[in-house]
């Protein structure tokens, strides 16, 4: 057999990745099968946005490989990516709607029984209409969506809830992972998403990882970081975390810090830069304003919680006041090397080495962060504070100098953020609270003035609280496993799902923990069973075509949303005063008003490329993906969120927005790279009215819950390489499941010895909210310091979120999954 260079690279990559995971080389590394049709696609997992080639034979995805023509992954995939072909074929795949029934009727305490789609939508419509007819009906219906939705699925859902039902109770699971990043961008720059791109990796001199285990969570990007570190003379890697993990293997400056003290470390770096007179005076004068942020903001817990008492700014956590550079200098001056070393537990020499990296004007620095920053009771603050460091030095918006927020889901950027599926957002960074933004949206959606609700809806954690309290009663969960992944499951999650006043619908391909807690389960088409689009962490939008059909009666989220809208006459959901403004809408359905509006339905099904299925086009008689995308794209064109025409994405390996005159943008806010920065402006942070970014003075504050005499250990939760999020896909891939079949509790050997425990012992882990049973691992890949334990959340047999606290960042409303107090004892 002869191998091309491409085949050789691919086979070696597969073998190396499989070997690293300790599993056998998969069949896809073997010679290709005959008669396979290959087409381009996008990986279903993390926010890196790796491109893949998808092989189809006899109506089934039989193989995938990294796309050699992709500028993101350059033909490589991580171990999860190499098994993509198996994620849709779990033995327990759902193929029919299932309703809890007893004696032939719906019963909240009944057993799941198969029903038809008509029956499913009948009872859904009944439950929704029952709530919507109440005086406060718009607050009693809600939806929890996903950063795994395709762009048009999120957009269609936003139209249905925010325009159709006039309810802003739509929030995505990206609230749990990216909301702090969004709030950080908006506060500092007035506009969302990174200014840099992955090309920064090959052009920088130093990498600093803040709360990010890229080696396991973004392994393809880590391979590029590793290559740069090993081939670029003098390149340095600094890694900061609350425990040691695989990314530490490459670290020149490894730092394990006490939870929450990253706030102090960031202020120390600013103090060092200023005290050494290293800051870029000209850049600061031209491009920066200084702000003192509000403190006493609480921890996002229920108002009755003790930590929320006497918090002066709990209602206005986002407010700030102007300050001068000298005032900022005085503010950070108290964060001395000695003080921060003692507080954080990081040796002084390492803190100083880190500060010197940032302070050296000749060293280009890329700062990467993920959940360690974002899932933080002060998550917005730490996002603001890393920008402080880069702005002081002017190390921003140019090749190799970039503060870079990495995303965890494949379209947390493209769908949750850009489309605006958060409870307060509209497309293209607009918000429901802004009169002008609502007016623009109503115009583009052809709605009567006053249709959109100006009141912010319930965010993710608040949705669970409102379900429990009986104030949110008709609830639809799509493309996410929130019962397993939301915090404080025992006290705030499960009670709301089982509240007799509520009707819970879950759309999912598999019987997840969330699905099994619902009243109605809708079987969902997956990944290559529908046409899709994702937007990755570097603003790259990528498309794929439907490759195969979904099994049985499973339907895409897009079909479900649009088909359900047919069940509502406009008179059933809108008040008379709205209808009077646009009487031609009388008698129409929400489907007619939202999706058959002359814009979404303007493209015929014949526009679909020959040889490919499109089940939604077949069902509706037009090309809904194209119509929805073009309507959505009209929000951002001319407003620094420009997307290319629909057809361009099926031809390209993704394009990074803004795309102006067919050209993508690699670096934002800097002249010569960004088309929205005019000649002579140099740098312009045009999200702010005066073009200046904000540096914030924000203090160190303790965590919402810290260890004490009884609960004497910190608990941090997260992921491992082999599994993704709740494991609903990866645990159904035999090779991945066998490699890591169960979660374990990673513990320092000394902490184990104090409790008379040995490696592999079965233990009980308890917090103030619940307990789980697991095994301890004192020799594994993750090495916590004494006083901290780490446990992944992929294992549905060990629901670690029974333990976690539902504290959130009061600004972003994102949960702090990294810090709560537990105790461990032998089971």
Curated annotation (Swiss-Prot):
Record text on cofactor binding: Binds 1 [4Fe-4S] cluster.
Catalysed reaction, written as an equation: 2 Fe(II)-[cytochrome] + nitrate + 2 H(+) = 2 Fe(III)-[cytochrome] + nitrite + H2O
Uppermost EC category: oxidoreductase
Transmembrane segments: none
4Fe-4S Mo/W bis-MGD-type domain boundaries: 36-92
InterPro entries registered for this protein in UniProt: Asp_de-COase-like_dom_sf, CT_Nitrate-R-NapA-like, MoPterin_dinucl-bd_dom, Mopterin_OxRdtase, Mopterin_OxRdtase_4Fe-4S_dom, Periplasm_NO3_reductase_lsu, Prok_molybdopt-oxidoreductase, TAT_signal
GO molecular function, one term: 4 iron, 4 sulfur cluster binding
CDD domains the record matches: MopB_CT_Nitrate-R-NapA-like, MopB_Nitrate-R-NapA-like
Binding site for substrate: 793
SUPFAM superfamilies: ADC-like, Formate dehydrogenase/DMSO reductase, domains 1-3
Assembly notes: Component of the periplasmic nitrate reductase NapAB complex composed of NapA and NapB.
Family: Belongs to the prokaryotic molybdopterin-containing oxidoreductase family. NasA/NapA/NarB subfamily.
Function: Catalytic subunit of the periplasmic nitrate reductase complex NapAB. Receives electrons from NapB and catalyzes the reduction of nitrate to nitrite.
HAMAP family: Nitrate_reduct_NapA
Protein name: Periplasmic nitrate reductase
Classification of source organism: Bacteria, Pseudomonadati, Pseudomonadota, Alphaproteobacteria, Rhodospirillales
Gene name, Swiss-Prot/TrEMBL: napA
